[in-house]
Structures are given as structure tokens and as C-alpha cells.
């Protein structure tokens, strides 16, 4: 009888632990310091991942958006990192040319138009810290933005992303919703 009670209690505790582990609370933002340069990079706790419906080929296209902020001796720069990747075919290369790389983010009927930086910023943390997809090669771009734009994205009800110069006929819709983590990130950077 005592054994049944102990096993029943253990089962209840195990079920509660599993339920707690499966909760969808966003993870906290992280501040990463480069010991060589002194640059601090704040990174969102979870990325926003989007997918484009398959268009009849064997590949499936994805985008990962990661918000970061660089603090280079008091000079703050908010950035949106974009990884484009494809299942089955490896990295999804970006188009070449001066006009490629435009990122359109439709937020509740408003359009945010971001242009890529000419090159990735120096002093970024390692790939794991920046949520670089590890299952396949990915193409990466960086876009300058601001906290208000990040706040707008984090509080949106509808979010659609397009790369008009890359995939003119396709929109990317939410696959894994990192907007709650983005909201935490903006609050973290805005301070008390």
C-alpha cells in the first residue's frame, strides 16, 4: 500500500516536471561580452522563425530573424539578423546585386522596409549564441533597425515577411513564434 502511494506521488511529480519543461515561456535575453574587444552584444532569448509554403519542389524555405544590440563603448546599434535556409538543398543563397536583400516585414497591415548592411558587423558572438540554424547551411544578412521597430514586431498580431528581390512570389509566415521573447528583449534594452 505504501509503495503504491509513493509510486503515485512520484508519477504526479514526474508529470508536473514534464509539463513545466514543455511550457512555452520565452527565454531571457543574454548579454555577451567579447573579452578581446569589450563589445557587448545583447541577444534575444528566442528567434522568430518563418516558413514559405512548398512550391512543388523538394525544398522548403525558412527564415530565422534574430534581434541583437551591439554596445561598442556606449555606441548602441540595434540589428535584425536574417538567416535564409532551405531543407534538403542546404543554404538558400541570396541574390547578388546592389538592389538585392531588401526585407519587407508586414506588421498588422503596416510595412517595414529594411535594407541590408553591406557586410556583417564585426565582433558578433558565435553561431550557437545567434541561433544560426545548425541542421543546414544558411545565408546571413544584417539590417539596422531601432527599438521601436522591434517593439512593433513583438506586439503584432499578424506578421508576414517577404524578400521581394529574392523570392518575389512568396511570403513567409510564422512557424515558431519568437515575438514574446522579442518583447522581453525590447523591455530588457529599454530598462526600468
What is the predicted role of each segment?
Residues 1-11:
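Bacterial N-terminal signal peptides that target proteins for export
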Residues 23-25:
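Bacterial signal peptide processing site
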Residues 106-110, 164:
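Short strand-turn-strand beta-turns centered on an Asx-Gly dipeptide
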Residues 118-192:
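Internal interaction segment
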Residues 29-55:
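Post-signal peptide N-terminal segment of mature Sec-exported envelope proteins
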Residues 93-101:
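Short coil-to-beta strand junction motifs in C2/discoidin
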Residues 18-21:
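C-terminal motif of bacterial Sec signal peptides marking the signal peptidase cleavage site
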Residues 84-94:
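Short amphipathic, basic-aromatic surface patches that mediate peripheral association
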Amino acid at each position: 500500500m505504501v509503495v503504491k502511494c509513493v509510486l503515485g506521488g512520484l508519477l504526479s511529480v514526474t508529470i508536473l516536471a514534464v509539463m513545466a519543461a514543455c511550457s512555452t515561456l520565452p527565454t531571457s535575453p543574454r548579454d555577451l561580452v567579447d573579452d578581446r574587444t569589450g563589445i557587448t552584444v545583447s541577444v534575444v532569448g528566442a528567434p522568430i522563425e518563418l516558413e514559405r509554403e512548398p512550391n512543388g519542389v523538394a525544398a522548403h524555405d525558412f527564415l530565422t530573424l534574430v534581434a541583437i544590440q551591439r554596445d561598442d563603448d556606449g555606441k548602441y546599434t540595434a540589428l535584425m539578423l536574417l538567416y535564409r535556409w532551405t531543407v534538403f538543398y542546404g543554404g538558400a543563397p541570396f541574390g547578388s546585386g546592389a538592389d538585392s536583400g531588401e526585407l519587407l516585414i508586414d506588421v498588422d497591415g503596416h510595412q517595414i522596409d529594411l535594407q541590408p548592411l553591406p557586410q556583417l558587423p564585426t565582433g558578433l558572438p558565435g553561431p550557437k549564441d545567434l541561433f544560426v540554424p545548425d541542421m543546414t547551411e544558411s545565408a546571413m544578412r544584417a539590417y539596422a533597425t531601432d527599438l521601436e521597430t522591434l517593439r512593433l514586431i513583438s506586439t503584432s498580431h499578424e506578421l508576414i515577411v517577404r524578400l521581394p528581390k529574392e523570392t518575389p512570389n512568396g511570403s513567409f509566415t510564422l512557424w515558431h513564434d519568437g515575438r514574446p521573447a522579442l518583447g522581453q528583449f525590447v523591455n530588457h534594452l529599454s530598462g526600468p
